[in-house]
Every structure is written in C-alpha cells, then in structure tokens.
A protein has these predicted regions:
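Basic polyanion-binding and macromolecular-assembly surfaces
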Residues: 2-300
Length: 300
C-alpha cells in the first residue's frame, strides 16, 4: 500500500521536496506520451527511464549506490530510496523500502485473482522501435528466454494468485504502516556530513508520506475509512523491543522535510526521451546471452 503514498509528491504542496523526472515516448502515429517516474512501476529503475537518454546518469547513480554512496540517487530520484527500488536489469542494486504499508484482512473469505505488470507505455508504438521484436518475444512460450517483459518493455501476466477477499460481520481490516529507521541508516554519503544530510532529507520525505492523509479510494467498490471507535496508535519500537507512544502531525513533518530538503539540496527536475535503439539493443543482448547459455548446456 506504500505505492499509493508516492503520487502525493506530484501535488504542488510538495513541489519543493523532490525533483520531477518525465520521459517522453514518441509514437509511430506522430503523437507522444509523457511518463512521470513517480508513476512508473519500478521508479527510476523502470524500463521507460533506463532506456531513455538519461540512461548514463541513472547508471552512474546506481553504480555510486552500489559502492555505498546513495547521494547521487537521492538527487535523481529520492522516492526510489523512500519506497524501495531494484535495478534488476543492470547493476542489481536493491534498496529496501524505508516506508512500507500493508492492509490485512482478518477472518475473511479468500479469493484468487489474476495480476499483471503493465509497462509504463506501449513500446510497440515507440518511434524507431519495431513492434515485431516485442511481438515475437511475447509470443514465445514460458520457457523462451529473453522475453521483452523481462526487460520491462512489455506487460507480464500472473494468473490465480491470492487476491481479493469477501468480508462479513466477523471480519476486521487492519492497516499497518512502518517507517524503518534501520533501513534509513543503511543509506550513506561520502562523508559524515553528507550522510547526515542525506538521511535527514530521506527521513523528511518518509515522514511526509507517512503522515499525509490517504485517499479513501482503494479500488472500485472499496472505500477505506478509519474506525472512529478505534483510533490509530503510533509507536516507536527500539532495537531492544521496547515501545513508546509517539505522535507527529503532517504539518510538523512537512516543516521538517522542507528544512532538510533545503539543507540537502534537491536535485534538478529533468526531462528525457525514450531511446528505442537502446531498448532494441538490450533485447538483442539479452537474447544472445540466453542463446549462448542454452548452446553451452546442449554442448555438455
């Protein structure tokens, strides 16, 4: 549910807190689509960003993070640090969520559902990127290597997964949100001062997301509202397991975040264009790599 928090940073009220990165995808029919990284499923590691003309800048930020310096990534896409990010298609950098949120349903009737990863845009319509390559790869069987969806360039389906639930008079819904300071402490810069500034900045963003009023709309037919008879409880849980009550208002969180952002220095907002040639090369390289492994196995 933390993914529902991230889009609040598109709100004008929080414009000073984060840079905005938008990617333009040109279509074969002459039109263009603009994708905000805040809306991309894999954030700054999403295929629409990784195969844009910001690719080198993103690669460098991940390489720096791999070496233990997350400042470059925070300048580029701080919400990728707050809500977690996995650069699975290149550097392998995996950053845990600092803010996570779950909604648990107790004493309910379980259902199943089919799920899908939807690519940030329809890459088959991208100028200079032929639909045939994507269609051929997606038409392959489950065992076929180098599918376009593996690179985030096409949709991916998953059937019969655990899904929705039906509630009755004995059911209960519990929303739990966690802001992990231990995950925050894993972030560092190239000096003690840079580390302190980085952590304060990311903590500020996390607190803003953590305390912001949430839209009651969960999905069609499901509106979630607090139970006035069971007010929310806030606790600080220390390493030794002791707990103390804690409260913070959204206004206080925002004031802290603004001060921390000014001290850290928010990165510049950027615009970029999807690069179909880079995406085609990545598809070809992935297919060649898999074919080589397959040939090696057959030769044994």
């Amino acid at each position: 549910q933390a993914n529902r928090m991230e889009p609040i940073f598109k709100n004008d009220r929080y414009a000073e807190l984060v840079p905005r990165i938008t990617i333009t995808v040109k279509k074969n029919d002459g039109t263009a689509e603009t994708v905000d990284v805040l809306d991309a499923g894999h954030r700054i590691a999403d295929g629409v960003a990784r195969f844009s003309d910001l690719s080198e800048k993103i690669e460098d930020a991940f390489q720096q993070a791999k070496k233990g310096n997350a400042v470059h990534l925070a300048k580029l896409s701080p919400t990728s640090l707050v809500f977690g990010c996995w650069d699975s298609r290149s550097t392998g950098v995996k950053l845990p969520r600092i803010v996570r949120s779950t909604i648990r349903a107790l004493d309910v009737n379980k259902l199943t559902r089919s799920a899908a990863y939807m690519a940030a845009t329809n890459f088959q319509e991208a100028e200079g990127f032929g639909a045939q390559e994507v269609q051929e790869l997606e038409a392959a069987s489950e065992k076929k290597e180098a599918k376009a969806s593996t690179l985030g360039l096409a949709n991916a389906l998953a059937n019969q997964n655990p899904g929705g639930v039906l509630l009755d008079e004995n059911s209960e819904l519990l929303r739990e949100a966690v802001l992990s300071l231990s995950a925050l402490r894993r972030l560092a810069g190239d000096s003690e001062e840079a580390t302190a500034s980085l952590r304060a900045y990311i903590l500020g963003l996390a607190l803003v997301a953590f305390t912001a009023p949430q839209d009651t709309f969960l999905r069609m037919g499901c509106e979630l509202t607090p139970d006035p008879e069971k007010p929310a409880t806030w606790e600080v849980v220390r390493n030794d397991g002791t707990r103390t009550d804690f409260t913070v208002t959204h206004d206080d969180a925002l004031a802290f975040a603004l001060e921390a952002a000014r001290d850290f220095g928010v990165g510049e907002s950027l615009t970029a264009t999807f690069d179909p040639a880079a995406a085609k090369k990545a598809l070809k390289d992935a297919k060649d790599k898999k074919d080589k492994k397959k040939a090696t196995r057959k030769g044994k």
